[in-house]
Amino acid sequence: MTLLDLSADDVLNTTRAVRKRLDFSRPVEDDVIRECVATAMQAPSGSNLMTMQFVVVKDAEKRQAIGEIYKQCWAIYSSMPMFAGAIKKEGESEQAQQDRVVDSATYLSEHMADAPALVLGCTAGRVDGAPAMMSASVMGNILPGMWSFMLAARARGLGT
């Protein structure tokens, strides 16, 4: 797949949550996923630990199972006080935008399994029972890599 003719600023300024515009019928070649993962692995890592790993799931049954877990997590999140749908904006247009965000995120929770591939960012080890700061540090360590994966996909014309 050819890279789009985009500057770094273009990629950063045009990478959005495109949940309702994802083309679930568009196949994604393994080589393209590998390129995006290779780019993502160049991301910074706390203490240079490099504990991030990526799991690519293309099997339909496994994608379905992951989609079900995502739906369950979405249901839990949607009952929390910090849920995007619980946030009330001041202006009418701002509230309409917030409602669209919630609508598109709900859509993704219902269609996660429809993606031709799921790429899961993981980190080595577990944080069960660890202090909050350690948990946040370990889990946050994968975020630069996941963002880099999203930017690499965007540079190749793919949504994430």
Stretch-by-stretch model annotation:
Residues M1-V37, L49-M50, K58:
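Specificity-determining recognition surfaces
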Residues H111, L151-A152:
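Hydrophobic/aromatic ligand-binding patch that stacks against planar heteroaromatic rings
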Residues L49-M52, A155:
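Short secondary-structure junction motifs
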Residues A40:
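Covalent nucleotidyltransferase
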